[in-house]
């Protein structure tokens, strides 16, 4: 979508100061989804500047109070973060970007098969819900991720690390079915085994569950498994966001917003590069 001077004045798109700043091509992907400024009261800080500040924080993991001075005051950015978090903006942006990315790959906008996995992550002294993952020996929280066969995120949830993968499967697939009722099958690893848990997940979502097991139990460490490597790759992409190297948040709601924001940032970059290459 070409930009004109009115667009540039509206969103105050200027020359990027940091590599995380949004470009015109990236902004065009999500501009229609950004909330319109209120007509009354003081003029709010430009949404693009807030986006740049948040994406900088995701990549560099700086605390709120250490936000560089060429961004707005950290309280301004923080208040907008909470407002967008509470409105569900990032989940909406991720959903739209995933549909656009699938169509750019020549696929239908909605998937029919998904892959499920989890990632346990340590927390800090910030407090909030947490638990101990006995299998991975990690005290903190667990990120549950559902992706399509391209590795694009369909659903993500966060729980205490003590929640077993199989116990999180039913609410995950139920959310997937509510969002994308065309999904008919899912692929999971051995951590999701359990007849009772799988029956509950199928009853909640009508999505079939296939467990993909390791064929060589003698080999320790990571092994690429057919049908499951795409979700491992997506989890690897998330690790580029240093803000997500640990869970610094006091609430799961904020932790989920940062995760969704990181996914949106990755999708924006991917789509913008694809469009530039085709131009």
Regions found by a protein language model. Give the residues of each.
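Short alpha-helical elements
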Residues: 1-279
């Amino acid at each position: 979508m070409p930009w004109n001077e009115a667009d540039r004045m509206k969103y105050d798109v200027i020359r990027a100061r940091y590599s995380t700043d949004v470009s015109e091509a990236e902004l065009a992907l999500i501009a229609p989804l950004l909330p319109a400024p209120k007509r009354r009261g003081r003029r709010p800080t430009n949404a693009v500047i807030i986006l740049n500040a948040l994406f900088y924080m995701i990549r560099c993991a700086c605390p709120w109070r250490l936000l560089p001075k060429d961004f707005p005051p950290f309280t301004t950015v923080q208040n907008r973060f909470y407002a967008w978090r509470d409105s569900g903006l990032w989940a909406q942006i991720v959903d739209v970007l995933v549909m656009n990315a699938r169509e750019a790959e020549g696929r239908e906008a909605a998937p029919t098969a998904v892959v499920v996995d989890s990632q346990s992550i340590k927390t800090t002294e910030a407090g909030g819900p947490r638990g101990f993952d006995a299998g991975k020996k990690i005290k903190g929280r667990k990120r549950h991720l559902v992706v399509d066969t391209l590795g694009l995120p369909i659903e993500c949830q966060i729980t205490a690390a003590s929640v077993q993968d199989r116990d999180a499967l039913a609410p995950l697939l139920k959310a997937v079915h509510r969002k994308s009722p065309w999904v008919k099958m899912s692929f999971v690893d051995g951590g999701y085994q359990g007849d009772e848990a799988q029956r509950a997940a199928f009853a909640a979502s009508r999505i079939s569950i296939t467990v993909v097991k390791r064929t060589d139990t003698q080999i320790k460490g990571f092994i690429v498994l057919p049908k499951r490597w795409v979700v491992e790759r997506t989890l690897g992409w998330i690790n580029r966001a240093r803000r997500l190297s640990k869970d610094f948040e006091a609430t799961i709601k904020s932790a989920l917003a940062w995760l969704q924001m990181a996914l949106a940032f990755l999708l924006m970059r991917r789509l913008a590069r694809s469009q530039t290459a085709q131009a």
